[in-house]
């Protein structure tokens, strides 16, 4: 099989570009040479906050990328076209129209790999009748649609693919020596916090990590309010324990960044030992590893409209962290049945309750084992390769 991957890799860094890089690395590094990969790095945006905008510069770049794709088709006989479709955003869907109008006639099979949700729902509820017609004409009937979880089969089905398969996102194991090093440190911190909670030890800080786009709909402000509420509970019980929220990521909206900074100065987010919320900005790979290694729990209380399968959740699982996550779209599907860390959306009180329950404990739900079974790059590679090669037998 000859596969053209028409999708961009970092920069800018976000879940979609990260997973495209994982796909390329996995298919190219494998001893299995049954898939020959060609890549058009179709980067249009310089920064994350530029992703949803439209401009003549982007149109020119897109036309150039399409010409390169057609040239690779004619020069190397590449006959399978891999593409990451837009979420339900009008400008992004129009981009997809242009790509398919120019490229689709040259390729035998079209493969969609959804890294964001909502295009099917948008076609039904947000698109004009003529937009639905054009979308079905240009985007409909792909040979294969790859989705991140069973929850998204219905959304992908709106474009009438011949086949839909589920392939979760992945990450390389960041701590293969987890049992010998990181787990030991986590157990020691949990023991110290347990002693502080029982009144028999010095002050201990429980670190909760938020690692995502800094955006209200991702649950950032709910996490902030939850940490304020939980610290108030601990202070009322006169316990020598505190909870600190470490926030890492770029802000999507300047107004929300201003609101966040103003919130940090309020009395309920500061105690005699310092701030209870620490903002670290965008975390590069080294900083991210540092924050995950020192964290005692992870929170992502998202109700983001286009939420898919956050890579940060996979990395938190790989680090064996207890996780608080919302019952939103695909997110519960990623966790073991009956997982105790699930909360409703927009519920800071529930987040505080779950974090309170995690104090002095390490992960008891086997989330690292969940990562090793389902979300490693090896598991991803096996599933994605099987899905792609199955097209050859049709």
Where are these regions (language model features)?
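A charged, aromatic-enriched C-terminal amphipathic alpha-helix characteristic of glycosyltransferases
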Residues: 360-392
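Short alpha-helical donor nucleotide-sugar binding micro-motif in glycosyltransferases
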Residues: 282-283, 290-295
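Nucleotide-activated donor-binding/catalytic signature segment of Leloir-type glycosyltransferases, i.e.
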Residues: 249, 258-286
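Conserved acidic donor-binding segment of nucleotide-sugar-dependent glycosyltransferases
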Residues: 337-348, 356-362
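Short hydrophobic beta-strand element within catalytic cores of glycosyltransferases
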Residues: 318, 322-325
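Donor nucleotide-sugar binding/catalytic pocket of nucleotide-sugar-dependent glycosyltransferases
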Residues: 133-196
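Conserved donor-binding/catalytic core segment of Leloir-type glycosyltransferases
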Residues: 4-5, 183-218, 224-229, 246-249
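Acidic donor-binding loop of glycosyltransferase active sites
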Residues: 293-308, 321
């Amino acid at each position: 099989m000859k596969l053209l991957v028409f999708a961009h890799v970092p920069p800018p860094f976000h879940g979609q570009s990260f997973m495209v890089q994982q796909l390329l690395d996995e298919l190219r590094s494998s001893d299995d040479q049954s898939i020959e990969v060609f890549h058009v790095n179709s980067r249009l945006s310089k920064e994350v906050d530029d992703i949803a905008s439209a401009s003549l510069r982007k149109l020119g770049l897109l036309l150039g990328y399409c010409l390169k794709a057609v040239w690779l088709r004619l020069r190397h006989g590449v006959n399978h076209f891999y593409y990451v479709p837009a979420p339900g955003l009008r400008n992004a869907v129009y981009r997809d129209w242009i790509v398919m109008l120019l490229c689709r006639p040259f390729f035998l099979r079209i493969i969609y790999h959804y890294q964001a949700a909502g295009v099917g729902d948008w076609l039904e509820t947000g698109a004009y009748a003529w937009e639905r017609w054009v979308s079905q004409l240009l985007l409909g009937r792909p040979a294969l649609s790859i989705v991140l979880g069973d929850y998204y089969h219905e959304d992908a089905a709106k474009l009438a693919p011949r086949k839909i398969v589920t392939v979760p996102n992945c990450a390389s194991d960041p701590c293969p020596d987890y049992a010998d090093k990181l787990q030991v440190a986590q157990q020691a911190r949990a023991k110290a916090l347990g002693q502080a909670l029982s009144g028999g030890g010095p002050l201990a800080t429980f670190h909760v990590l938020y690692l995502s786009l800094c955006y209200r709909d991702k649950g950032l402000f709910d996490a902030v309010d939850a940490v304020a509420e939980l610290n108030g509970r601990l202070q009322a019980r006169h316990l020598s324990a505190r909870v600190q929220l470490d926030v890492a990521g770029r802000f999507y909206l300047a107004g929300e960044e201003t609101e966040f900074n103003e919130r940090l100065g309020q009395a309920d987010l500061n105690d005699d030992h310092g701030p209870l919320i620490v903002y670290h900005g965008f975390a590069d790979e080294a900083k991210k590893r540092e924050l995950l290694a020192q964290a005692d729990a992870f929170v992502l209380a998202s109700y983001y409209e286009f939420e898919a399968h956050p890579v940060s959740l996979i990395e938190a699982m790989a680090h064996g962290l207890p996780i608080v996550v919302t019952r939103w779209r695909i997110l519960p599907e990623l966790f073991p049945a009956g997982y105790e860390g699930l909360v409703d959306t927009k519920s800071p009180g529930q987040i505080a309750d779950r974090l309170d329950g995690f104090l002095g404990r390490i992960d008891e739900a086997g989330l690292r084992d969940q990562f090793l079974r389902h979300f490693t790059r090896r598991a991803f590679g096996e599933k994605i390769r099987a899905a792609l090669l199955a097209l050859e037998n049709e």
